[in-house]
Amino acid sequence: ALSSAASDVYKRQPFLLNMTDRVVEKNGKRLRLTQLEYQIMKLFMENPDKALTREEILDTVWGRGYFGEVKIVDVNIRRLRLKIEDNATNPTFISTVWGYGYKWGL
């Protein structure tokens, strides 16, 4: 069996993201995320204290060749919040930076 290196794992309590297995856990329980939700989660975990613009999220997750509506970011953030937040209407993990984008944490 392949062992996963520590660098392949991000821990931001109560979450653990394992890049080798492409799995995200919350309090040890595996979350059922879509490919896009996983990529967004990974981006936030790689940049825990940085506010990210919608465009940065779009370019990283969808790729620079994506020419759709930037609102797709908001839609997927909302879906992700429903899965990871204790209360999606009052998020504590992914916060909105008004007029800018999103940030991990408050």
Feature map (PLM): residue ranges:
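Single conserved hydrophobic/aromatic residue that forms the stacking wall/gate
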Residues: 1-6, 10
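Positively charged, aromatic-enriched patches within helix-turn-helix-type DNA-binding elements
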Residues: 21-23, 28-93, 97-100
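Conserved active-site beta-strand element of glycosyltransferases/polysaccharide synthases
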Residues: 102-105
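Short boundary/linker motifs that mark transitions into or out of structured domains
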Residues: 11-23
